[in-house]
Structure formats: structure tokens, C-alpha cells
Amino acid sequence: MSVINFYELPISALAIYLKSTTHLNQQDTLPLSISATTEPSYPIGTNIDIYHFKQQWQQLHKQSIKNEPLQYISSTESIEKQQVDWLINLFDTVFAAKNVVLVRGDNDPEYFPATATHPARIEFAHGFFQSALHEISHWSLAGAHRRTLPDFGYWYAADGRTEAQQKAFEQVEIKPQAIECLFSLMCGRSFRVSQDNLHADFDTSQSTFAIDVYHQAQLYINQPQNLPTDAKTLLTVFAFVCHDTIETGR
């Protein structure tokens, strides 16, 4: 099977669409409810200071590609950690009204529903930026009911699955990984699918998973109205905050 190049996806077309259907207010912020010109507005939770987050992202992006020192972070802290801190702050700000927080986990990812005293927690694995994007994609797809269930009520079998279990796993993962792909590309990060099957004892060479994820991502770009609302919200923020930096930095 040929290698799938996810960078070929026209992410700029999606960025242009999202920005063209969204208005900034005079303070260069995304307001409480993003105002769309061609479809109903969707809630964002609070005013988002685009300049603040964009300035930080520009510094982080510059450091990551040119290894230049940053003014506001210690040289002993990794860029990955700073990017994760930035993402947590952005996510928690954007979705403040959703009673959910993004949490750096020490172990495997897990979702904990909100309680009477604590917000829901999206815990991603080992502090990795990519894991955070993946778990956010699952959250964005989960409806109101599944967000009340531990791990969204998902069935999960660990690595070492049977061939039938692997096929079921891949079927469930197509849309989350397609959304993760769009998040990644909008942030200028690389993306590759995860089949999570390092210990498979069967032939995986005929799997169509990668191309299925590619086609689903392509479908979301061509029909952005089919994106989950919260995924669309975050992609819109990334389009304003991250994508211009990527385009001018290449």
C-alpha cells in the first residue's frame, strides 16, 4: 500500500473558509459567540484574545523550527512542554462554558465526566501534544450523553487485539483521527495514523485504515458543516491563531 501524505490535504482551504465565516471584534478577539455569515453561530465560551495566543504561538513556532531562544520561557523547559501548556490554556479558555478541562496525564489517556464539584477532565497521555489533540477529537465527537460516561462509554481492548477486534478498533477511530489530523495540520504539526497494534500477530498490510482516515479528513474539508461543533470551534481558533504563522513561516 502506498504511503499516505496527509500534508497534501488542502488545510488552507479549510482555514480560509472558517475565517471567512467568522468575525473578529474591534479588540482583535473572538467574542462569546462566533458570528458566522453563512451558518448559525456556535458558542465559544468567553472572549478569546487572539493577539495574546497568537504571539505566544509565533514564539513557540519560531523556536521549534529555528532553535532560537524565547524571551518568556526557561531554557531548561522543553518546547513540547511549553506548547502543551499553551494548548491547555487555550482549550480551557475556549471551552470555559463547557465545564471541562484539559489535563496533562502521567499514564494512559482517560476521560472523567463532570461531577457536582469538579469539571469534566480530558486526561491525555504522558503530557504529549499529539495525545492531547487526539483526546480532544474524541471529546468533540461525543454527544451530550456520552460526555456523562467514563471514557465516553467506549469499548477498548489493549494492544494485542485479535484481527476482528483490530478491525472494530479502526472503524471507531476513523473520525477521531481524521479530526486529529485537521487539528495537527492547522497547527503546522505532522500527523500519522495510529493503529495501536504493535503486538499484532496477524497480517496488517492490507488495512485501509490510513486511506480511510485521509478520505474522512478530506470529506470534512470539503463539507465543513459536517464537522462536530466543538471541533469546528477549535479549528476556527487554530485558523486565526496558528495557521497564519505557519503560512508565513514556510
Describe the role of every protein-language-model region:
Residues A142-E173, Q195-A200:
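Post-HEXXH active-site segment of zinc metalloproteases
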Residues A97, V101, L185, C242-G249:
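N-terminal secretory/membrane-targeting helices
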Residues T115-S131:
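Short pre-active-site segment immediately N-terminal to the catalytic Zn-binding motif
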Residues S2-S12, I16-A116, Q166-Q171:
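Auxiliary, metal-adjacent structural segments of Zn-dependent hydrolase domains
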Residues Q130-G143:
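Active-site recognition of the HExxH zinc-binding catalytic motif
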Residues E170-M186:
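An active-site-proximal "capping" alpha-helix that borders the catalytic cofactor pocket
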Residues L182-N197:
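Short helix/loop segments within enzyme catalytic domains
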Residues V3-I4, Q195, H199-R250:
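Pan-zinc metallopeptidase signature
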